[in-house]
Amino acid sequence: MSLLNVPAGKDLPEDIYVVIEIPANADPIKYEIDKESGALFVDRFMSTAMFYPCNYGYINHTLSLDGDPVDVLVPTPYPLQPGSVIRCRPVGVLKMTDEAGEDAKLVAVPHSKLSKEYDHIKDVNDLPELLKAQIAHFFEHYKDLEKGKWVKVEGWENAEAAKAEIVASFERAKNK
């Protein structure tokens, strides 16, 4: 089955499927799944010696304001393989702006059927403060050595904001 056929979720916006592009703690290589072919491409080698603090992927059949599917960070006890799909629950969103405009990153935790470890996390404020700081620090600095690129982290928003972003981006993609 092609990743292109993976639905956005089981019960939007509460129960989503995230297609993983970059595993947590991986080498500083940005991978992207081509949305037309489903192939995993090397997008670029990151200039900074940093790694993604969480698994990084997207929700199929969504369209964020930056023109791409909605980006999602997924903390897990182990790194996930690129191209894998994980069932999740959205808990928050990191609002940012970069050189191209608005760029939000959702945070979602594994669904209870996969692990009970995250059942107590209902909102981004339930995540460990250190993890939130690592995520914000990563995105504030991962483009530092790339000429003409920058990121400004604006802050965290709650689970309801994340769910609203999912619904809006799903509708945006449907109406495109």
Swiss-Prot record:
Annotated residues for binding of Mg(2+) 1: D66, D71, D103
UniProt binding sites for Mg(2+) 2: D71
Catalytic activity, reaction form: diphosphate + H2O = 2 phosphate + H(+)
Stored InterPro entries: Pyrophosphatase, Pyrophosphatase_sf
Cellular component GO terms, alphabetical: cytosol; membrane
Enzyme class: hydrolase
Disulfide bonds: none
Keywords (A to Z) from UniProt: Cytoplasm, Hydrolase, Magnesium, Metal-binding
Stored PROSITE patterns: PPASE (PS00387)
A Pfam family of this chain: Pyrophosphatase
GO molecular-function terms, A-Z: inorganic diphosphate phosphatase activity; inorganic triphosphate phosphatase activity; magnesium ion binding; zinc ion binding
Subcellular location: Cytoplasm
Cofactor: Mg(2+)
Single Gene Ontology BP annotation: phosphate-containing compound metabolic process
Keyword Secreted applies: no
Chain residues that bind substrate: K30, R44, Y56, Y142
Known EC number: 3.6.1.1
Subunit field text: Homohexamer.
Function of the protein: Catalyzes the hydrolysis of inorganic pyrophosphate (PPi) forming two phosphate ions.
Family: Belongs to the PPase family.
Protein name: Inorganic pyrophosphatase
Upper lineage: Bacteria, Pseudomonadati, Pseudomonadota, Gammaproteobacteria, Enterobacterales
Gene: ppa
